[in-house]
Amino acid sequence: MLPTLFHKWHALELRELLPNYATITAMNKYADQVKQVVKDLYGVDINAELTRPEAKFGDYATNVALRLAGQLKRPPRDIANEIKQKLDQSGQFDEVTIAGPGFINLTVSAKELDGDLERAFQAKIPYGENRDGRGRVVVLDFPSTNTAKPFSVGHMRSANQGWAARNLMLATGWKAISDNHLGDYGSPFGIWVVGFRMFSDEEKLAKRGIYELGDIYIKTKQAIKEEQAKGEHRIEEQAQDWLLRIERGDPEAVAYSDKFNQISLDHIHAVMKRLGVSTDYEIGERSLAKLGKEEVARLVKEGVAEQNKDGSVIIRLDDYGIETPLLVLKSNGAPLYATNDLATLAFREREFKADRAIYVVASEQKFYFAQLFAAAKKIGYDAELIHMWYGLVDQINEDGVREKMSSRKGVVLLEELLDEAEKRARANAKSEGISDEDIHRIALGAIKFTDFSADRRTGMLFNWDRMFNLTGYSGPYVQYAAVRINKILHDNKAGKPDPDYDYRAEKQVILKLLDYPSVVKQAADYLEPHRIATYIYELAKEMNRYYETTPVATKDVPAGVKAARLGLLRRVAYVFEHALKILGIDIPERM
């Protein structure tokens, strides 16, 4: 059973009774020993940070002698030799060597490292997790879909990255509240009403649903563009009038808005279910429209915002290094994104007591969020505000050039992408009779792992062949490694491990497992889920190397050795499942 980080956020109330343990890793343990030796030798209190060198140099390395050289005014290699002698005397290390100008390399016995791993797994906190965020609340804003539009590939990245960020926050002790802040208000709704009356009818809407609404929007925007070319604005003015009618609560206008929103929500829920993503709340812009205008009026009254002669309202941000003021209300009194976002900030601070808010939105909005966050500081909001931005979804075109992903019709719809992924997953299946559920897991794993295969800021390169490559950096490659382990564990009963087994054959696997808590911490601290993907791929490669040299459960393996190796595999299986769950990827039963 997986730890409760995958339950709804309110389930964490029970776990908050746990003490706020620091993450205890083998690296910390050996770093503390080096730190104590330095203190004993020189009376200096210094953090002896350890890193993982290439395996040929040892298990851990430290530059503490180089850092002490200036303070002690002595050659770093002499200091390193003195530290080495003390560490040798401790009997803790198999080997201590010095490299270069004074780097100290430490080699630990595999059996000692396995003991470290066993103790870490027995801790009260699930392995890989910590309590850095204990007692604090974070609100994650994703995927923030627009209603009356089909779910596009563009919103897929927000959903995937946001879900992983939410899981990372839970894994590091935060109470995480997720909100799909629906774009269910604003000028597009006026456009849909006018467009529906111009280009569609109830029969078409009932038959095609969200896709009819998408076409209506495109046709109406084109009609507005053609009118503007003639110097006319009739359709645009009608759309604005319908928006104001919705705002005033006009029954006919509200009926249109409710109808379009319900069609949209049904579609959004269906697609998010296929994507394996959900949120705790769906607080739409429309529900906060009144609060938004009230906030603007309050800010004008308090002198934080100022009203221009044309009636528009701005917040000046020069004191925060931003020359362009934030426009928070149009001259005709119509709201903007900023109007609603300020209301949302006020709502979340009041209702959720949020200490942090993470907005998972594409890089195109970087300047806007810089403005919004500066305005929030000026207003006096206390929450830490983070724009977790990501690059676009790209593809390689027929000329071999990387470009923004699109179809002949323009926007690539996520449902079509998921359908194609499942078709390819079935075609690439290695076994007969794989269930539809497993096909879906493989397809989704391929897409999501690609999303996390590089730093979110670099963009996502979409390539079908790479996505389903069973020998490369892909979701199916990692899933297959996990399936293989699960099958070995399923086919072999656990026994009593040989107490004298030295774990030399498993040492690199153990070291990789010991890295996991620090990888989770770094991924959470920097909001970089790709660190989890990189780690789990490296673990899969390490396991494949291990299988090549070490039989796990063949008949010629002694029972005690077999039990010891199966015990290690159970820990590997746990880490695979835990890490993939953070990314929102499920392990198939068969592939």
Where in this protein do the model-derived segments appear?
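AMP-binding/adenylate-forming
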Residues: 18-19
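Short hydrophobic alpha-helical segments enriched in small aliphatic residues
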Residues: 8-11, 22
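Short, charged, solvent-exposed linker or helix-capping segments at domain edges/interfaces
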Residues: 115-120
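Non-catalytic interaction-recognition regions
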Residues: 23-114, 125-591
